Amino acid sequence: VSGRVLDENGKPVRHSLVEIWQANAAGRYPHKNDNHDAPIDPNFTGGGRTMTDEHGRYQFLTIKPGAYPYPNHPTRWWRPPHIHMSIFGDGFMSRLVTQMFFPADPLNDVDLILQSVPDARARERMIARQVPMADMPMLNEVGFEHNIVVRGQRQTPFGV
């Protein structure tokens, strides 16, 4: 997962802390309060942190998380694969929290959290773009690009 943190004018937000946390490939978080019966992956920590560079770029090497049932809802609906992200930086007053979703996942259309964002274009800004991993061809995997805009009309939805 890679991308850039940008301001409302498309300029990089340099030296911001980007933090991620996510479920493992089976859809389970590595903490004691996750009651999903999927297996724990002992080799997966579930999160990471990095600083944006001079161009506002960030990058994480991780796995695609699995879907999981949302336990606190009467119908136990399933959350689509997603990665939680937070951004800390000098240009804004508080921690910004959002989620990154994967393209073409059928659960995106029925996810109560993603669908709580009323503007369809804003929801699209929460869905990453699939890109080749040109810098790591030996992995034979794909990457996902997700740019985060911290304010303005094209702002990434936060607080979801």
Language model segments and positions:
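Beta-strand-dominated extracellular/periplasmic modules and repeats
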Residues: 1-127, 131-160
